[in-house]
Structure formats: structure tokens, C-alpha cells
A protein has these predicted regions:
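Membrane-water interface regions at transmembrane-helix termini and the short interhelical loops
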Residues: 12-18, 44-59, 78-99, 147-154, ...
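Transmembrane alpha-helical segments of multi-pass small-molecule transport proteins
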Residues: 5, 28-43, 68-75, 234-260, ...
Length: 591
């Protein structure tokens, strides 16, 4: 075992070739991790879920305004950086060139940024907003346009601006100024050398915990949807036990990618995943009609821009229904993105060395926002248009024949509910049920049960596959698209886990940009353990509560980091001006 510390490096302990840690940060993060998992396992269940929901609601009620204000502030700061006088500064030496091609760079940041979530929510969120329109939004938008605009709002400019700010700050301090690739470095212009002590240890530990909570949420979501896809394809039963087994299996795949490293592992998988995801999107686009997709893309963009100013600052301060909606949707998303920002920001910084600030902001904010909007249009608009067209068809047939037809729609078993909205069980223990033709919109809100009536189906992770089934008449195309979607989710899962373990390892090793593989394997396993524990404790709502809670203290860190970046850029600009003045002074005539 060896220990080393210099004026430019944080203390590190090295055990052999494969383990390197910052003694305080690593130990503190592991202790918190063990406590979290122990509490989730020992006290998991309805009571634990209730406490998680109450904590989430308490934070939303008292600090929702902070999430809303900070995310809009991050977007404004990103625009200022891209258009300001520091936009030419390179993240590294002045003569340094980007390490990765633009295509590889984009594939890696997008796969890490929000891949699992986009697949999970691209169908479910537009349906939710369509069925329960957000209260108090701008007039002039019909239900479909409003649902799509709000969905794109949550996945558009704001989260990518946040990632850009965090990634830019880390890259600037790490590659331009030569500081440790660590979150404490971002606070140095404001807090001075105190960040190299215990205060910095706290900041880096917060970054690790926020990352674990954010990634655990995504891994839990991914496990639910992989379970739904395998159930659709192979009849594998759904449930928490199956999902935890899937987390274990896919985490094992992620460890293989960890061993292969950044170039052979994450980069190759990200490039493959982008190709497969693009293929899935094309299937949906041509299945729903290319012209309809292009028309919807333009209309959705206009609707998004129409609501953007109002929604960016909306807290629901004057209406309890609006406040509840903002807390359940916008505040959750903003907190989720903030808890993801240490991971995504650090990863983007790690693969963005050599790019200018303008190139970095443009690539990280604009391109993924456009792709996310197109993706959501392909899936979300197809879902809503299919539903409205079937309703119109049924209405026309009802007027003419009094026998409305839902021909072409698959049938599902829907359970009957009692007066308390509970499924009715028959004497043999199965749910009372009838077979009904459903669109994807109707499916999400229906009490769907398994064909044998033994169990209720979680429609949220399943609705993506229902959309696919209702869009294609050919069983072969349905199986191809469902299989493709399931593989994409698995690959997004693997790249997210691998990328996050690399980022956590960088922080926990004291800012080493290339930490050894042993501790990265440990963090990959830890992410799967946290996701499994939170699923056991209370499912998706427990995962959401963990993300909202972990994001709160880190929001303060990010606000101070923005201040620190502005100061550091100003100092760099002044040094460049001084250098230019010295160079431009003519030689003395008397000399």
C-alpha cells in the first residue's frame, strides 16, 4: 500500500494495480451506501414507501421553487457561455484537438444522458398529459399538442443545458487549469484552498451519492421495461423479484464493458446502441407515416416554443392543483436531471477534451434536444394520433350503424373493479375479467391483468410494447420491433451503468481521470445493489423519491460551481488580454 499527495493532487491510497481510492471520500460514500441498502432491505414495504413519498412531497412543497429557478438559470448561463467572449476558449491546451469523432462523441453522451428514460417515458408521458391535461397552461393548445409540448419541455433544453454546465466546468478546471477532475475543483474560485480539505470531501461525497441515486432510478426503470419486453416476447412473469434478477444479470454485462474500458467498451456499445435506436425510430416513423411525422415535428416544435417561457418559471404558487402537478412532474424531472448531472457531466467532460466552449455547448445542448424532440414525436405523437383516429372511426361507425368497430386493435384482458377501484377476485382466486380491444392510450389507464387472471399487469413499462403491437399488422414486424426495443434498453442500461461507475470511480479516486479497473467494478456492482434495494423498498416511487432527495444539496453545489466557473473564465480572459498587450508593445526606440 502506498500513499501520495502533492500540491496539485488529492491524497490517494493504492492497493496493488487495480484499486485506488481517496481514503475519506471513498469510505464516506461506501458507509452511506451500506446504510441506504440496509434501511431499504430492513424497512422496505408500504410504510417505507409512504415515508419516501412524504419526503418527496415535503421537498417539492418547500424547495420546488429552487429546482425551477436553478434549472432555468443553468439554461441562461449556457446560452451566455456559447455566445459570450469566452466561447473560443478550448477545453485543454490551445493546440489540443478532440479525442473522439463528433459521431462517437454524440453517441456516448446521448447513451449516457437519458437513453433508458426516453424509451420508458416516450409513450407513457404524452399519454399521461393527454388524459390529465396539466392545469393552468397556455390557452390555444389542444390536448394532443399540449401533451407533446410538455413532454418535450421535460426532455429538451433544460436538462442538456444542465449537463453542459457541469461537463464544461469539470473539463475547464481539469483540462485547462490542471486541477483534479473532481467536483471540489469547481468551487475553488469561490471557496479557495478549503476545497482541498474536508469541505471538498463533503462535496465529492455528495456528488457520488447524487449519482448513485440518479443512476439507480434509471436502472430500476430499465429493469421494469426489460421485464415487460421479455414478458411480451417470452412470457417471463413480471414482478420485483424478476426485475432484481434482471438488474443482477445486466449489471454483470456492464462489468464486462468496464473491463474492456472506455474505447472498446462504452464507445463501441454507445455507437451500436445509437444505430439500433435510430432503426427502431425509423420503424415507428414509417409505421405511422413519414409525412405525418414531419408535420407533427414542426407542430410539436412550435408548441414547445410557445409554452417554453411560461413553463420555465412555473412553480404553481397560486393554485394547489398546479403546485401538485409541478411537484409530481417538473420538480421530479429537474431533481432527476440534477442527480444525474455529476455522472453525465463528468462523463461528457471526460470525452470532450480539446473542444471549444462554443462547440461544446452547441453539441451538448442543441443536438440532443433536437434528437429527443424527434424521438418523442415518433413515439408520443404516433400514440396519441392512433388513439384519436380510432375514436373518430368509432364515432362515425356509431352514427351510421350503431356498432362501433375497433377492428385492427389487439385485445387485452381487463379486470373488473369494485366501488373502491379494487380488482374483483372470483371464487377460484383469479380476477374477474373481460377481453377488450384497447389503444395504447386506453391500455395505460386500464386495470389490465394477465390472461390467466392471476396477476395485474404494470401498464407503465408495458405500454411501449403495446404501441408497437397496435401499429404493425405483421406479427413478424411486431416481434422485430419489440426485440429491437428490448435490446436497446439493455444496451442503454449497460452503457449507463458502465459510464456511471467510471465517473464515480474518478471522483472516489481523488480525480484520477483514468482510475484502475478494480474499484470501477465495485461501483458497477454498487449501482445494481442500490437499484435493487430501492425497487424492493417501494418500486418506482421510491426510486423517484431518492432522486429528488439526493438532488437537493447538490443543487447548491451547482449554483456555487456556476459562480466559480464565471470567475475562472474572467481570470483566464484577463490573463489572455495581458499576454496580448505584452506581445503588441513595440520595441523601445532607445533600446
Amino acid at each position: 500500500m502506498t500513499s501520495n499527495k502533492t500540491t496539485t493532487e488529492l491524497p490517494r491510497l493504492r492497493f496493488g494495480k487495480h484499486i485506488e481510492i481517496h481514503p475519506v471520500v471513498f469510505t464516506a460514500a461506501v458507509l452511506i451506501l451500506v446504510a441506504l441498502v440496509a434501511v431499504s432491505i430492513l424497512y422496505g414495504g408500504p410504510d417505507m414507501l409512504g415515508r419516501c413519498i412524504r419526503l418527496r412531497d415535503w421537498i417539492g412543497d418547500r424547495f420546488g421553487w429552487l429546482y425551477v429557478a436553478s434549472m432555468s438559470g443553468f439554461l441562461g448561463f449556457a446560452i451566455w457561455l456559447a455566445m459570450g467572449r469566452y466561447a473560443h476558449i478550448r477545453l485543454g491546451r490551445d493546440d489540443e484537438q478532440p479525442e473522439y469523432s463528433t459521431l462517437s462523441w454524440f453517441a456516448m453522451l446521448f447513451s449516457a444522458g437519458m437513453g433508458i428514460g426516453l424509451l420508458f417515458f416516450s409513450v407513457a408521458e404524452p399519454i399521461s398529459h393527454f388524459q390529465s391535461p396539466p392545469p393552468g397552461f397556455a390557452e390555444g393548445l389542444n390536448a394532443t399538442r399540449l401533451a407533446m409540448a410538455v413532454t418535450i419541455f421535460h426532455w429538451g433544453l433544460h436538462p442538456w443545458a444542465l449537463y453542459a454546465i457541469v461537463g464544461l466546468s469539470l473539463a475547464f478546471f481539469g483540462f485547462r487549469l490542471g486541477m483534479p477532475l473532481s467536483f471540489r475543483s469547481l468551487l475553488h474560485p469561490v471557496l479557495g484552498d478549503r476545497v482541498w480539505g474536508r469541505l471538498g470531501d463533503v462535496v465529492d461525497t455528495l456528488a457520488i451519492i447524487a449519482t448513485l441515486m440518479g443512476v439507480a432510478t434509471s436502472l430500476g426503470i430499465g429493469a421494469k421495461q426489460v421485464n415487460a419486453g421479455l414478458s411480451f416476447l417470452l412470457g417471463i412473469p413480471s414482478g420485483t423479484g424478476t426485475q432484481i434478477s434482471l438488474i443482477a444479470a445486466i449489471t454483470a454485462l456492464a462489468t464486462i464493458s468496464v473491463v474492456l474500458g472506455l474505447d472498446a467498451g462504452i464507445r463501441r456499445l454507445s455507437e451500436l446502441n445509437i444505430v439500433l435506436a435510430f432503426g427502431l425510430m425509423l420503424l415507428l416513423i414509417f409505421g405511422g407515416g413519414l409525412v405525418a411525422f414531419l408535420s407533427a415535428s414542426i407542430e410539436n416544435l412550435g408548441a414547445y416554443l410557445q409554452i417554453l417561457p411560461f413553463n420555465s418559471f412555473r412553480t404553481g404558487a397560486f393554485n394547489s392543483a398546479s403546485r401538485t402537478w409541478v411537484n409530481e412532474w417538473t420538480v421530479f424531472y429537474w431533481a432527476w436531471w440534477i442527480s444525474w448531472s455529476p455522472f453525465v457531466g463528468m462523463f461528457i467532460a471526460r470525452v470532450s477534451r480539446g473542444r471549444t466552449i462554443r462547440e461544446f455547448i452547441t453539441g451538448v445542448v442543441l443536438v440532443p434536444t433536437v434528437v429527443a424532440a424527434l424521438w418523442l414525436t415518433a413515439f408520443g405523437t404516433a400514440t396519441l394520433r392512433q388513439h384519436t383516429e380510432f375514436l373518430e372511426q368509432a364515432a362515425l361507425q356509431a352514427d351510421s350503424t350503431n356498432t362501433p368497430s375497433m377492428a385492427g386493435l389487439p385485445q387485452y384482458w381487463v379486470g373488473e373493479l369494485d366501488a373502491n377501484k379494487q380488482l374483483i377476485r372470483q371464487d377460484d382466486g383469479t380476477f374477474r375479467r373481460t377481453q377488450v380491444s384497447l389503444t395504447a392510450v386506453e391500455y395505460l389507464s386500464s386495470p389490465v391483468v394477465t390472461p390467466d387472471g392471476q396477476a395485474a399487469i404494470d401498464t407503465l413499462p408495458t405500454v411501449l410494447f403495446v404501441l408497437i403491437e397496435t401499429m404493425f399488422q405483421s406479427p413478424l414486424l411486431v416481434m422485430l420491433a419489440v426485440g429491437l426495443a428490448t435490446v436497446c434498453i439493455v444496451l442503454f442500461f449497460v452503457t449507463s451503468s458502465d459510464s456511471a461507475s467510471m465517473v464515480i470511480d474518478i471522483i472516489a479516486s481523488g480525480g484520477n481521470p483514468n482510475p484502475p479497473v478494480g474499484t470501477r467494478l465495485f461501483w458497477a456492482l454498487a449501482e445494481g445493489l442500490v437499484a435493487s434495494a430501492l425497487l424492493f423498498a417501494g418500486g418506482l416511487r421510491a426510486l423517484q423519491a431518492a432522486a429528488v432527495t439526493a438532488a437537493l444539496p447538490f443543487t447548491i453545489v451547482l449554483i456555487i460551481a456556476c459562480w466559480g466557473l464565471a470567475k475562472a473564465l474572467h481570470n483566464t480572459g484577463e490573463r489572455e488580454k495581458s499576454k496580448n498587450r505584452v506581445i503588441s508593445v513595440p520595441p523601445s526606440e532607445n533600446g
